[in-house]
Amino acid sequence: MMTMTTMADGLEAQDSSKSAFMEFGQQSHSQQSSPSMAASHYPLHCLHSGSHHHHQHDSSPYSGSNSYNRSLPYSYVSHPHHSPYLPSYHSNASGTQTRLDATEQQKTTVIENGEIRFNGKGKKIRKPRTIYSSLQLQALNHRFQQTQYLALPERAELAASLGLTQTQVKIWFQNKRSKFKKLLKQGGNPHETDTLPGSIALSPRSPAIPPIWDVSASSKGVNMSANSYMPGYSHWYSSPHQDAMQR
């Protein structure tokens, strides 16, 4: 009986020591795992705190910019499509277009009302040359021989009598004066150019033109033979009657 009791006590002692050893092992394992958990928890906490701190730093420029915007004397517009330079550019473009339109209108006015006309490219276009009749040229030349310069009432009266505009009379007198001075410089006679084409009127200094044939004799009733028209050529021709007599 003593032997069985001793063996049972020995087994209990071994169990108690084994259980104590297991508890100690569990405690040591728990102590070893707790620092790793603490270490793992610390980086997470640091990461969380760092992210929170970083978030604060990220949000700080906005707050700083807001405070900076409040300190500026003008409002800062951060949108790229609403730049303050764009309205001025559009206003300048519209101003340039307005000036171009005004220039085109001015050119049109010059074309309609002015003496010197302009086309779309800005080049001068000469007005069509005025064609004067023989009667108008005769009256203008006669008036030019009297005076080379006309007053406004005289020019208006002459233009109305000839059916011309005052501008046409003015331009004709200007051209006539330039031709007159040019002929004087060359030493010619300016009055030789006063003859009118298709007109019988002659200048006083022009020599008399001899008549081609004299018709006064026929008007007086003087009989002229047919051979008198060709006196030197009658022997070239012979009549058929004379040819028969000679044969």
From Swiss-Prot:
Gene Ontology molecular functions: DNA-binding transcription factor activity, RNA polymerase II-specific; RNA polymerase II cis-regulatory region sequence-specific DNA binding
Subcellular location(s) per record: Nucleus
SUPFAM superfamilies: Homeodomain-like (SSF46689)
InterPro entries: Distal-less_Homeobox_TF (IPR050460), HD (IPR001356), HD_metazoa (IPR020479), Homeobox_CS (IPR017970), Homeodomain-like_sf (IPR009057), HTH_motif (IPR000047)
Sorted UniProt keywords: Developmental protein, DNA-binding, Homeobox, Nucleus
Domain of life: Eukaryota
Region spans: Disordered: 22-66
One GO BP: embryonic skeletal system development
Listed Low complexity bias regions: 26-49
DNA-binding region: 125-184
A Pfam family reported for this protein in Swiss-Prot or TrEMBL: Homeodomain
A GO term from the CC aspect: nucleus
Protein family membership: Belongs to the distal-less homeobox family.
PANTHER family linked: HOMEOBOX PROTEIN, HOMEOBOX PROTEIN DLX-6
Protein name stated in the entry: Homeobox protein Dlx6a
Protein source organism: Danio rerio (Zebrafish)
UniProt gene name: dlx6a
